[in-house]
Structures are given as C-alpha cells and as structure tokens.
C-alpha cells in the first residue's frame, strides 16, 4: 500500500535513519552510516505519495523487513 512521505520520514527517524530534505530538486536523501544514500522522490514535498514499489526498495536497501516497516506507518 502506498504511504505519504511524511509518514515514511517519521518511521525512518524512529529507526535511527537520517532523512535530508532536498536543497535543490525534489529528491530526499535517506542516509545510514555504512550504507550508500538512497534517494526518495518527493515532488510534492512531504505530502507526496510513495508507491509500494519504492517502499519495498527502501526496505531492501537498508535491510528492513517490509511487513514490520508497514506496520509502523
């Protein structure tokens, strides 16, 4: 199920993962020490809707369980 970027950012912060707002453009950078950055497109800012495909990719990139992540949303 898709989720708002605002909700995703809140969960990532709970998990100790840093989310940087874009200085230019529309991509938020998700960072965790020891892992390369992961860009998340937020064309409408924090109210952007992020598809299930990108949520699964984000979880896979950071080694998070998708079902557990979705329960936190």
Predicted regions, residues:
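Basic nucleic-acid-binding interfaces
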Residues: 1-24, 29-73
């Amino acid at each position: 199920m898709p989720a708002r970027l605002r909700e995703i950012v809140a969960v990532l912060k709970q998990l100790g993962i840093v989310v940087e707002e874009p200085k230019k453009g529309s991509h938020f950078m998700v960072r965790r020490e020891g892992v390369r950055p992961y860009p998340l497109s937020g064309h409408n800012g924090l109210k952007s809707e992020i598809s299930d495909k990108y949520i699964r990719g984000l979880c896979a990139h950071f080694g998070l369980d998708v079902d557990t992540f979705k329960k936190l949303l």
